[in-house]
Amino acid sequence: MAEGLRNRQRPRRTPGRVAAARRYAAWMNSPAWRRRRRRWASEETRRSGRIVCAVCSKPWHERRDDLHHASYSRMGRERHEDLVPMCRACHELVHKAIDASTAWQRLIAKGHRRLVTVSIIARLKELKDKEKQQ
């Protein structure tokens, strides 16, 4: 789909990133995160009636699909808008795009993860629309 995604490189592994990755993994595997996901899904269903992937618009399922963190600044205290529903395939594409671009990584390092997320989602939607037209 996107040429640049094939040659992706993971960001450098610094001690700070390693520690952050450990905290993230611990949170994502916790019962508290599973409760937060359920609360998020319940609230989103009340707000919009149904939940769809932010990229491809396929129905989102709590057990099968992912919530992308548009911000890590409130890890463990996420606001509703910090979480973006995505099917597993689209979530992987978003992370591949981040990994493939040092520009995206620099923006994230400066605290602009939400902007990067929104921009990548918009670009992926454009690419998917072009694929449908062909």
Predicted regions and their residues:
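Cys/His-coordinated zinc-finger cores
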Residues: 90
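Histidine-centered nuclease catalytic patch
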Residues: 52-85, 94-106
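A boundary/linker detector
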Residues: 1-61, 100-134
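Surface-exposed loop/turn and secondary-structure junction residues enriched for glycine/proline
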Residues: 30-31, 36, 73-75, 86
